A protein has these predicted regions:
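PRPP-associated nucleotide enzymes
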Residues: 1-184
Length: 184
């Protein structure tokens, strides 16, 4: 059973976090000529699109190479569920060989999705460097030694609690919620 959602980030707080993340990317990657930003399907895509919009509108950076990476068949729990996973498409606008790649997701939890992304990205080339950007870092929940390079907000939550990210385009509001597990 789940408890009442607790608001962790409001729309203005999400906006500030995304703008800060965009600035950090800009500091590290300058004109992005050697960088490919890749959102993990499905939930990292909204973060990628928001960052791309900020970089385009506020910093006039056009033609940033982006991509969408599906990790469905690379997950270690792929065959463990009764219901089949629904795969999304992988779309890379530019080759990643020798480029700096920034993997983007909404919530970093156990690290298993990122491990799957690292395996999946090998199918498309060998980047010179891979970084990780996440809007929310559940820092004490890792099963694997994976740490983000860019973090919007760190959240401490119990193992069975859920952190959900809502986007205006998909859910009618920008918000991040913590939903406590009320099982005893």
């Amino acid at each position: 059973m789940e408890g009442q959602p607790k608001l962790l980030l409001s729309p203005p707080q999400i906006k500030i976090a995304l703008e800060r993340l965009a600035c950090q990317l800009l500091e590290r990657h300058l004109d992005f000529s050697e960088t490919v930003l890749i959102g993990l399907q499905p939930r990292g895509i909204a973060v990628l699109q928001r960052l791309q919009h900020i970089l385009s509108e506020q910093y006039h950076l056009q033609n940033i190479a982006t991509g969408k990476l599906d990790i469905t068949f690379f997950r270690d729990d792929f065959r463990r569920n009764d219901t089949p996973h629904r795969a999304s498409s992988t779309e890379l606008e530019a080759p990643i060989e020798g480029k700096k790649v920034v993997l983007i997701d909404d919530v970093l939890y156990t690290g298993r999705s990122i491990r799957a992304a690292l395996t999946a990205i090998d199918s498309y080339g060998r980047p010179s460097e891979i970084e990780l950007l996440t809007l929310i870092d559940r820092r004490f929940s890792r099963h694997l030694p994976i740490q983000p390079d860019y973090v919007g907000r760190q959240v401490d939550a119990l193992q069975n609690d859920k952190v959900t990210v809502n986007w205006k385009e998909l859910h009618g509001e920008d918000a991040v919620y913590l939903i406590k597990d009320t099982h005893e």
